[in-house]
């Protein structure tokens, strides 16, 4: 189980990303439209004023049950430990253990 502070920090980041997403899109479009390099630098300076945690690259996928940040499966939103447990108890529909 991950520390609650890490899970809360990730929730905060997710909220910031959603909040500043529209502003980031506008700035990116302005950079594409800008013709000179100086204009691009000025717009880039505006984007640097935004909070650091509002960048989507700072988000990490976490397990929805345990909060574990490593070894997550995108399809399920679970870490490998929880995925294995739930697959063995038939809690995940359509998931079967392979054998050959």
From Swiss-Prot:
**Localisation:** Plastid, Chloroplast
Q: Which domain of life is it from?
A: Eukaryota
Q: Name one GO molecular function term.
A: rRNA binding
Q: Which Gene3D superfamilies match?
A: 1.10.287.1480
Quote a single Gene Ontology cellular component term: chloroplast
By its UniProt entry, which SUPFAM superfamilies does this protein fall under?
Glucocorticoid receptor-like (DNA-binding domain)
Query: Pfam families per the record?
Result: Ribosomal_S14
- Could you tell me the keywords of this UniProt record? Chloroplast, Plastid, Ribonucleoprotein, Ribosomal protein, RNA-binding, rRNA-binding
Please provide the Gene Ontology terms (biological process) for this protein.
translation
Signal peptide residue numbers: none
Q: What does this protein do?
A: Binds 16S rRNA, required for the assembly of 30S particles.
- Similarity remark: Belongs to the universal ribosomal protein uS14 family.
NCBIfam families attached here? PRK08881.1
Per UniProt, subunit arrangement is: Part of the 30S ribosomal subunit.
Q: What is this protein called?
A: Small ribosomal subunit protein uS14c
Record organism: Psilotum nudum (Whisk fern)
Gene encoding this chain? rps14
